[in-house]
Amino acid sequence: MKKLISVKYFFFLVALFLVLLSNVVLGQVNYRHFILAGRIDLSEERFFESISNFNTAIRYDADNFEAYFLRGVAKFNLNDYQGALDDFSRTLEIHPLYVRAYHYRGITHDRMSNYFDARADFKRALEIDPYNADLHIASGATSMHLNAFEAAVKSYDMALLINPRLSNAYLNRGIAKRFLEKPEEALEDLDKAVYHDYFNTEAWLRRGMVKLELEKYDTAMTDFNQALELDAQNPLVYFQRAIAFLQTGDTLAAMRDYEKVNQLDKRNALTYYNRALLHSLREEFDLALPLYELVTAINPENVYAWFNRGITYFQLEEFQEAADDFTRAIILFPDFAGAWINRSVARNKLNDNAGSRADYEQAMSIIKALNNEEGNPDSLYARYADSTYFDKIFALQSDFVNGESRKSRLQFQEVDIAPYGAISLMPTTDKPLRGQKLPYFTYSELFVSQFNSENDKAFNFFLTTKAADYFSAASEKPLTVSSIPAAFAEGVSQQIKGNYSNAIDAYYQMINHPDWGTYAALNLSVVLAGKAELLLAAESYDNAIMITRQKSKQKPAIEQKVADYKPAREVLQQLLNSDRKNAFAWYNLGNIHLQSQDFHPAIDAYSEAIKYEPALAEAYYNRALTLLFLGENELACSDLSRAGELGLSEAYAVIKRYCQ
């Protein structure tokens, strides 16, 4: 009998081992599948899609460094440098000797202007792999960003000692020598860069730029033309060739090249600005004005754009608009004497003599401070000690990325930066194909998943931020399913149709239901908030009509009102009293606080939502927008990175705008 028991036990162990082995093998197969799929996405520049595959690979094997590293590469290409940094750091926690992770993390630090950390990473990488020429090139680039050009040259020398045919090393060394005011040596290196990689557009372009600085216009033009032969869609080459045309006096040819830049790169504010300046110099103010408007739309904090647009309005004798633009310039840079003087002149034209005189006196006080013999002129700018302030008010966006490249890089997409809406339970007849997602974000819970698996498949329920009217095709479906309480089905149907009062009545009947009460409360909070916003909009419309009927020339003081969200807030508080871990209720409460302009309570509510549902991408996104509004950009950018990682593509456009 003992022997029989031991045999049974042996067979049990064998069976258990085979089960465990099959699970391990399956996990490895799935991991490799998603790594391969992600690599294919990376190679085809589908960076956003690759992140999803690497996320899945990490779920199968959270201790394998490869998925983190590749996901970091994808985030880097989406300009999510903080997210990339986190993934490269995680890679090194798992594999402390992985040179490529040090290399890429160093480059990421460099992009974030963390030059000390970048040099530390390159140093560590070179300790592991001292004969890696690419590492020496990357280290040289960081030295250049620190204006340590001699050190940069030494790094490039080492790279060329390892690989004497490395075009990029010659290219970068040539640029470094140009900064060291060794133009002839710089040209020699740039000649070698072209020689060793004839089809390197960058080498032709940079050599042309150095020749341009040396006033060798004819040969510079030849290099730019050759660069365009290799890459006719490169906006930076057209931009540089336009400068060459200007230097040789061919303004019309320069204008054509600038126009080509904006055809390829529609958000290149620097080029719009240059075009506007050229039109202004030609006294074509009517053509300059719309270009300045594009600049202010892209870079609303650029002081020169407002200042020059003000001058353009003045030349067109639109003096009030001119004064308004000079005011914007003054708000951005209060010590801009020229803006005070110009506004003084504009106000004089508007017969505002007192305002004109006050502006003139302010300008004179600024000029006097600049000319104060006892002080340093720079002292006037001491209050703006943070250099990023000047970067913000003087810099113009100019990525020089053409339209085709923008299509694969979601950070360049045009998005309306607005928070995601509240979450409610909606029915949908959409049927995604296997492996595909619905065209909007959805979430599910155990009860909802069980219901979806048991119904007749005419529709499914999902928790979503998509507006209710999107689901009109499924509005009557719940009414036909006997397992759904009639009142809840009626509430959903009325919510989709926009009949708020009927929906509210129906949901109140269901709010204490043991199974459907939670979802009734969620939906009820959304409907109550929507009704409050509708009532506020109607009231504002009535006020606007009464205001337009007034004969007074004075502008009435209109109090900015907020919708009455109290009923919606009370429903959510009641739900949270009985189910404190309901992430979706916390999220909806966060939205109500945000709409009420209670920003810190909104952040707290979103944080609770994330605590109980770490994959709630919209909570990260909305919390990030709230933090941005409060000026907490670093915290916001971390949230945006997480939102993008979880699948919200809009996050990368916001990162591009606020996290660089």
Which role fits each region the language model picked out?
Residues 36, 70, 104, 138, ...:
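Canonical tetratricopeptide repeat
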Residues 29-60, 73, 77, 107, ...:
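Alpha-helical segment of the N-proximal tetratricopeptide repeat
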Residues 315, 337-502, 542-567:
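Eukaryotic alpha-helical solenoid repeat scaffolds
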Residues 44-53, 77-90, 112-124, 146-158, ...:
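Structural signature of tandem alpha-helical TPR/SEL1-like repeats
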Residues 35, 42, 69, 75-76, ...:
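Position-specific recognition of the canonical hydrophobic site in helix A of tetratricopeptide repeat
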Residues 30-32, 65-66, 99-100, 133-134, ...:
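Helix-start (N-cap) detector for alpha-helical repeat units in TPR-like alpha-solenoids
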Residues 304, 311, 526-530, 542-600, ...:
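Alpha-helical adaptor scaffolds
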Residues 60, 94, 128, 162, ...:
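Structural marker of alpha-solenoid helical repeat scaffolds
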